[in-house]
Structures are given as structure tokens and as C-alpha cells.
């Protein structure tokens, strides 16, 4: 495992986890907004099925946001309401690439979050995040397929 992805478990507190989950929540809000916008503005007959799939992604991302917000509350924190910035484009390939890049980042963060939850003994939360990861990886695969590219490796070095 790359050193950038290793975690000093003893350094993560519940307060840290709440802050990190709020960052994840901001990414989920970003995903909801981008999928809603892109599903309604992507043009061309080759993108009709893609638009429908993006609508499904929007609903799934909203479910993720609700789950993460509930877990933040459970941990004693306050779920925040500000999304990460949403990239807007009228170019279908750019839209899909923006979403693919965001999914890769989200997957890398959630993989790290699972380990952090387990280090704190928050095993149920880790399982919830694993469930989210399954859908995020499905999104990554469908976006890569829509772009006609191989599914990228989500094991990117990320900052906490």
C-alpha cells in the first residue's frame, strides 16, 4: 500500500472522523448536483442511455448523502450543507470525465474512511461505507464505459 494511503489509526479521533465524513458529504452533494445537471443537459443520440444512467446515479448519490448525514449525527456531529464545487460543461465527454474523476477521488477517500472507522471500532459505519463503495465503483465502471476507456485505478494518493 502506498505510504500516502496508510493511516496512523491512533491519530484519528471521533471528531476527526466527523470532519472527514463532512468532507465526504460535500462530495456527495457535489455528485448529486453534477449528475442532475449533466443528466438533463447532455446532448446527442449516443448519450440518451447515458443520460438515463446519470439520473440513476443522482438518486444513488442522494441516498449516500442521507446515509452519511445520518452517521455524522449518530457520531455527535452536525452534517454540513455545502457541496464541493461542481464543474459545468456543455461538452458531453468533459461532463463524463468530470464525473469519472470525482468518482475516483470519492472511492479513494471511502477506502481510507473504512479503515479509519474500523480503527475507531465503528464497524457498522465501516459496513455502510462499504455499501456506498460498491455503488461508487459501479458508477466509475459505467462512466469509464461511456467514455470508452479502461476503468482507472482508484488507488490514488490522496490527502486526508
Where are these regions (language model features)?
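Iron-associated oxidoreductase/ferritin-like identity signal
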Residues: 1-160
